[in-house]
Amino acid sequence: MDAIKKKMQAMKLEKDDAMDRADTLEQQNKEANIRAEKAEEEVHNLQKRMQQLENDLDQVQESLLKANTQLEEKDKALSNAEGEVAALNRRIQLLEEDLERSEERLNTATTKLAEASQAADESERMRKVLENRSLSDEERMDALENQLKEARFLAEEADRKYDEVARKLAMVEADLERAEERAETGESKIVELEEELRVVGNNLKSLEVSEEKANQREEAYKEQIKTLTNKLKAAEARAEFAERSVQKLQKEVDRLEDELVNEKEKYKSTTDELDQAFSELSGY
Protein backbone atom coordinates (compact mmCIF):
# COMPACT_ATOMS: atom_id res chain seq x y z
CA MET A 1 0.00 0.00 0.00
CA ASP A 2 2.76 2.33 0.90
CA ALA A 3 4.55 1.28 -2.19
CA ILE A 4 1.49 2.17 -4.27
CA LYS A 5 1.22 5.57 -2.61
CA LYS A 6 4.87 6.23 -3.20
CA LYS A 7 4.50 5.16 -6.79
CA MET A 8 1.46 7.39 -7.21
CA GLN A 9 3.32 10.29 -5.68
CA ALA A 10 6.23 9.56 -7.95
CA MET A 11 3.87 9.46 -10.94
CA LYS A 12 2.24 12.71 -9.79
CA LEU A 13 5.63 14.31 -9.53
CA GLU A 14 6.48 13.05 -13.01
CA LYS A 15 3.15 14.35 -14.24
CA ASP A 16 3.78 17.77 -12.74
CA ASP A 17 7.27 17.73 -14.12
CA ALA A 18 5.90 16.73 -17.52
CA MET A 19 3.30 19.52 -17.33
CA ASP A 20 6.03 22.01 -16.49
CA ARG A 21 8.14 20.78 -19.38
CA ALA A 22 5.07 20.94 -21.65
CA ASP A 23 4.39 24.55 -20.61
CA THR A 24 8.03 25.37 -21.13
CA LEU A 25 8.01 23.73 -24.55
CA GLU A 26 4.77 25.52 -25.46
CA GLN A 27 6.28 28.86 -24.45
CA GLN A 28 9.41 28.03 -26.41
CA ASN A 29 7.22 27.06 -29.37
CA LYS A 30 5.39 30.39 -29.20
CA GLU A 31 8.66 32.25 -29.04
CA ALA A 32 9.99 30.17 -31.92
CA ASN A 33 6.85 30.99 -33.95
CA ILE A 34 7.31 34.70 -33.20
CA ARG A 35 10.96 34.50 -34.25
CA ALA A 36 9.92 32.57 -37.35
CA GLU A 37 7.35 35.25 -38.25
CA LYS A 38 9.93 37.98 -37.73
CA ALA A 39 12.39 35.99 -39.81
CA GLU A 40 9.80 35.58 -42.57
CA GLU A 41 9.04 39.32 -42.44
CA GLU A 42 12.72 40.13 -42.63
CA VAL A 43 13.11 37.67 -45.50
CA HIS A 44 10.15 39.33 -47.26
CA ASN A 45 11.66 42.77 -46.70
CA LEU A 46 15.01 41.52 -47.94
CA GLN A 47 13.35 40.09 -51.03
CA LYS A 48 11.60 43.41 -51.70
CA ARG A 49 14.87 45.28 -51.19
CA MET A 50 16.67 42.83 -53.46
CA GLN A 51 13.98 43.37 -56.11
CA GLN A 52 14.36 47.16 -55.78
CA LEU A 53 18.13 46.82 -56.00
CA GLU A 54 17.76 44.66 -59.09
CA ASN A 55 15.46 47.29 -60.65
CA ASP A 56 17.92 50.02 -59.74
CA LEU A 57 20.72 47.92 -61.19
CA ASP A 58 18.79 47.50 -64.43
CA GLN A 59 18.19 51.27 -64.64
CA VAL A 60 21.84 51.99 -63.88
CA GLN A 61 22.98 49.49 -66.50
CA GLU A 62 20.55 51.02 -69.02
CA SER A 63 21.81 54.53 -68.19
CA LEU A 64 25.38 53.28 -68.45
CA LEU A 65 24.62 51.78 -71.85
CA LYS A 66 23.11 55.07 -73.03
CA ALA A 67 26.05 57.00 -71.62
CA ASN A 68 28.49 54.69 -73.40
CA THR A 69 26.53 55.11 -76.64
CA GLN A 70 26.51 58.91 -76.27
CA LEU A 71 30.20 58.85 -75.41
CA GLU A 72 30.96 56.87 -78.54
CA GLU A 73 28.87 59.31 -80.62
CA LYS A 74 30.66 62.27 -79.04
CA ASP A 75 34.01 60.63 -79.68
CA LYS A 76 33.02 60.19 -83.33
CA ALA A 77 31.78 63.81 -83.50
CA LEU A 78 35.00 65.00 -81.86
CA SER A 79 37.06 63.04 -84.35
CA ASN A 80 35.03 64.49 -87.22
CA ALA A 81 35.36 68.01 -85.76
CA GLU A 82 39.10 67.59 -85.36
CA GLY A 83 39.28 66.48 -88.98
CA GLU A 84 37.21 69.49 -90.08
CA VAL A 85 39.39 71.83 -87.99
CA ALA A 86 42.51 70.39 -89.56
CA ALA A 87 40.97 70.82 -93.03
CA LEU A 88 39.93 74.39 -92.21
CA ASN A 89 43.42 75.18 -90.91
CA ARG A 90 44.90 73.88 -94.16
CA ARG A 91 42.37 75.92 -96.15
CA ILE A 92 43.09 79.05 -94.08
CA GLN A 93 46.80 78.60 -94.66
CA LEU A 94 46.21 78.31 -98.41
CA LEU A 95 43.92 81.38 -98.34
CA GLU A 96 46.52 83.37 -96.40
CA GLU A 97 49.14 82.46 -98.98
CA ASP A 98 46.75 83.48 -101.78
CA LEU A 99 46.00 86.71 -99.90
CA GLU A 100 49.67 87.55 -99.58
CA ARG A 101 50.18 86.99 -103.30
CA SER A 102 47.04 89.05 -104.07
CA GLU A 103 48.26 91.89 -101.83
CA GLU A 104 51.60 91.89 -103.59
CA ARG A 105 49.85 92.07 -106.97
CA LEU A 106 47.52 94.79 -105.60
CA ASN A 107 50.44 96.87 -104.33
CA THR A 108 52.14 96.56 -107.70
CA ALA A 109 48.94 97.51 -109.53
CA THR A 110 48.30 100.42 -107.12
CA THR A 111 51.79 101.76 -107.69
CA LYS A 112 51.36 101.53 -111.45
CA LEU A 113 47.90 103.14 -111.20
CA ALA A 114 49.27 106.01 -109.11
CA GLU A 115 52.03 106.59 -111.64
CA ALA A 116 49.54 106.47 -114.50
CA SER A 117 47.12 108.82 -112.65
CA GLN A 118 49.94 111.25 -111.96
CA ALA A 119 50.94 111.19 -115.60
CA ALA A 120 47.30 111.67 -116.65
CA ASP A 121 46.85 114.57 -114.19
CA GLU A 122 49.99 116.21 -115.51
CA SER A 123 48.75 115.80 -119.07
CA GLU A 124 45.33 117.21 -118.13
CA ARG A 125 46.96 120.15 -116.35
CA MET A 126 49.12 120.92 -119.35
CA ARG A 127 46.07 120.66 -121.62
CA LYS A 128 44.09 123.10 -119.46
CA VAL A 129 47.05 125.50 -119.33
CA LEU A 130 47.30 125.42 -123.11
CA GLU A 131 43.52 125.89 -123.47
CA ASN A 132 43.57 128.83 -121.04
CA ARG A 133 46.47 130.39 -122.89
CA SER A 134 44.62 129.96 -126.17
CA LEU A 135 41.80 132.25 -125.00
CA SER A 136 42.13 135.72 -126.49
CA ASP A 137 42.11 138.88 -124.40
CA GLU A 138 39.20 140.20 -126.46
CA GLU A 139 36.96 137.29 -125.47
CA ARG A 140 37.89 137.82 -121.81
CA MET A 141 37.06 141.54 -122.08
CA ASP A 142 33.69 140.71 -123.68
CA ALA A 143 32.88 138.36 -120.82
CA LEU A 144 33.86 140.99 -118.25
CA GLU A 145 31.81 143.65 -120.05
CA ASN A 146 28.78 141.36 -120.01
CA GLN A 147 29.29 140.80 -116.29
CA LEU A 148 29.59 144.57 -115.80
CA LYS A 149 26.36 145.20 -117.74
CA GLU A 150 24.55 142.58 -115.69
CA ALA A 151 25.91 144.05 -112.47
CA ARG A 152 24.78 147.55 -113.50
CA PHE A 153 21.34 146.22 -114.36
CA LEU A 154 21.10 144.49 -110.99
CA ALA A 155 22.24 147.69 -109.26
CA GLU A 156 19.63 149.77 -111.12
CA GLU A 157 16.95 147.18 -110.31
CA ALA A 158 17.98 147.25 -106.65
CA ASP A 159 17.83 151.09 -106.64
CA ARG A 160 14.38 150.97 -108.23
CA LYS A 161 13.11 148.44 -105.66
CA TYR A 162 14.67 150.50 -102.88
CA ASP A 163 12.90 153.67 -104.10
CA GLU A 164 9.61 151.75 -104.45
CA VAL A 165 9.89 150.36 -100.93
CA ALA A 166 10.79 153.79 -99.55
CA ARG A 167 7.77 155.31 -101.36
CA LYS A 168 5.45 152.61 -99.98
CA LEU A 169 6.90 153.13 -96.53
CA ALA A 170 6.29 156.89 -96.76
CA MET A 171 2.69 156.27 -97.87
CA VAL A 172 2.13 153.83 -95.04
CA GLU A 173 3.63 156.26 -92.53
CA ALA A 174 1.33 159.01 -93.86
CA ASP A 175 -1.70 156.70 -93.60
CA LEU A 176 -0.61 155.79 -90.10
CA GLU A 177 -0.38 159.46 -89.11
CA ARG A 178 -3.84 160.16 -90.55
CA ALA A 179 -5.25 157.13 -88.74
CA GLU A 180 -3.69 158.31 -85.49
CA GLU A 181 -5.17 161.79 -86.07
CA ARG A 182 -8.60 160.26 -86.72
CA ALA A 183 -8.26 158.19 -83.59
CA GLU A 184 -7.31 161.27 -81.56
CA THR A 185 -10.21 163.20 -83.12
CA GLY A 186 -12.57 160.36 -82.25
CA GLU A 187 -11.34 160.33 -78.67
CA SER A 188 -11.81 164.11 -78.42
CA LYS A 189 -15.30 163.79 -79.86
CA ILE A 190 -16.10 161.09 -77.33
CA VAL A 191 -14.95 163.38 -74.52
CA GLU A 192 -17.08 166.21 -75.92
CA LEU A 193 -20.14 163.96 -76.20
CA GLU A 194 -19.63 162.70 -72.67
CA GLU A 195 -19.39 166.30 -71.43
CA GLU A 196 -22.49 167.23 -73.43
CA LEU A 197 -24.31 164.24 -72.00
CA ARG A 198 -23.29 165.27 -68.50
CA VAL A 199 -24.56 168.83 -69.14
CA VAL A 200 -27.82 167.45 -70.49
CA GLY A 201 -28.17 165.33 -67.37
CA ASN A 202 -27.62 168.35 -65.18
CA ASN A 203 -30.15 170.31 -67.20
CA LEU A 204 -32.65 167.50 -66.79
CA LYS A 205 -32.19 167.61 -63.05
CA SER A 206 -32.64 171.39 -62.96
CA LEU A 207 -35.71 171.25 -65.19
CA GLU A 208 -37.52 168.74 -63.00
CA VAL A 209 -38.98 171.72 -60.99
CA SER A 210 -41.82 172.04 -63.41
CA GLU A 211 -43.46 168.66 -63.78
CA GLU A 212 -45.52 169.49 -66.88
CA LYS A 213 -42.66 171.20 -68.71
CA ALA A 214 -40.31 168.56 -67.52
CA ASN A 215 -42.59 165.87 -68.93
CA GLN A 216 -42.81 167.70 -72.24
CA ARG A 217 -39.10 168.22 -72.46
CA GLU A 218 -38.28 164.79 -71.07
CA GLU A 219 -39.18 163.12 -74.35
CA ALA A 220 -37.12 165.67 -76.27
CA TYR A 221 -34.17 165.15 -73.97
CA LYS A 222 -34.58 161.40 -74.17
CA GLU A 223 -34.51 161.66 -77.94
CA GLN A 224 -31.50 163.92 -77.70
CA ILE A 225 -29.83 161.51 -75.29
CA LYS A 226 -30.62 158.65 -77.67
CA THR A 227 -29.13 160.60 -80.54
CA LEU A 228 -26.07 161.48 -78.50
CA THR A 229 -25.77 157.88 -77.37
CA ASN A 230 -25.92 156.71 -80.97
CA LYS A 231 -23.29 159.29 -81.87
CA LEU A 232 -21.20 158.09 -78.96
CA LYS A 233 -21.50 154.47 -80.11
CA ALA A 234 -20.66 155.49 -83.65
CA ALA A 235 -17.64 157.42 -82.40
CA GLU A 236 -16.54 154.41 -80.34
CA ALA A 237 -16.97 152.16 -83.38
CA ARG A 238 -14.91 154.58 -85.48
CA ALA A 239 -12.29 154.68 -82.75
CA GLU A 240 -12.14 150.85 -82.65
CA PHE A 241 -11.93 150.73 -86.45
CA ALA A 242 -9.18 153.35 -86.36
CA GLU A 243 -7.32 151.29 -83.76
CA ARG A 244 -7.59 148.15 -85.89
CA SER A 245 -6.46 150.16 -88.91
CA VAL A 246 -3.48 151.39 -86.93
CA GLN A 247 -2.58 147.81 -85.98
CA LYS A 248 -2.88 146.67 -89.61
CA LEU A 249 -0.80 149.61 -90.77
CA GLN A 250 1.80 148.85 -88.11
CA LYS A 251 2.04 145.25 -89.37
CA GLU A 252 2.39 146.57 -92.93
CA VAL A 253 5.11 148.96 -91.75
CA ASP A 254 6.97 146.07 -90.08
CA ARG A 255 6.68 143.98 -93.25
CA LEU A 256 7.91 146.85 -95.42
CA GLU A 257 10.79 147.47 -93.04
CA ASP A 258 11.79 143.80 -93.33
CA GLU A 259 11.50 144.04 -97.11
CA LEU A 260 13.58 147.22 -97.03
CA VAL A 261 16.29 145.44 -95.02
CA ASN A 262 16.32 142.58 -97.53
CA GLU A 263 16.54 144.98 -100.46
CA LYS A 264 19.40 146.81 -98.73
CA GLU A 265 21.24 143.50 -98.31
CA LYS A 266 20.64 142.64 -101.99
CA TYR A 267 21.80 146.14 -102.97
CA LYS A 268 24.96 145.72 -100.88
CA SER A 269 25.64 142.32 -102.47
CA THR A 270 25.15 143.77 -105.95
CA THR A 271 27.41 146.71 -105.11
CA ASP A 272 30.11 144.33 -103.86
CA GLU A 273 29.87 142.29 -107.08
CA LEU A 274 30.04 145.50 -109.11
CA ASP A 275 33.12 146.66 -107.19
CA GLN A 276 34.75 143.28 -107.77
CA ALA A 277 34.00 143.51 -111.49
CA PHE A 278 35.52 147.03 -111.60
CA SER A 279 38.56 145.72 -109.77
CA GLU A 280 38.99 142.91 -112.32
CA LEU A 281 38.60 145.41 -115.18
CA SER A 282 41.15 147.69 -113.57
CA GLY A 283 43.56 144.75 -113.34
CA TYR A 284 43.40 144.30 -117.10
Curated annotation (Swiss-Prot):
Q: Name one Pfam family in it.
A: Tropomyosin
Query: Which residues lie in Basic and acidic residues bias regions?
Result: 12-21
Q: Where is this region: Disordered?
A: 1-21
GO MF terms listed in the record are: protein homodimerization activity
Q: Which UniProt keywords apply?
A: Acetylation, Allergen, Coiled coil, Muscle protein, Repeat
The SS bond pairs are: none
Give the tissue specificity: Expressed in muscle (at protein level). Expressed in pincer muscles.
> N-acetylmethionine (modified residue): where?
1
* Record-linked SUPFAM superfamilies: Tropomyosin (SSF57997)
The record's InterPro entries line, in alphabetical order, gives:
Tropomyosin
Question: What is the superkingdom listed in this entry's lineage?
Answer: Eukaryota
GO biological process assignments:
locomotion; muscle system process; regulation of muscle contraction
Q: List the coiled-coil residues.
A: 1-280
Q: How does it assemble?
A: Homodimer.
User: What does the record give as the function of this protein?
Assistant: Tropomyosin, in association with the troponin complex, plays a central role in the calcium dependent regulation of muscle contraction.
Its domain description in UniProt is: The molecule is in a coiled coil structure that is formed by 2 polypeptide chains. The sequence exhibits a prominent seven-residues periodicity.
Similarity annotation:
Belongs to the tropomyosin family.
What this protein is called in its record is Tropomyosin Por p 1.0101
Recorded source organism is Portunus pelagicus (Blue swimmer crab)
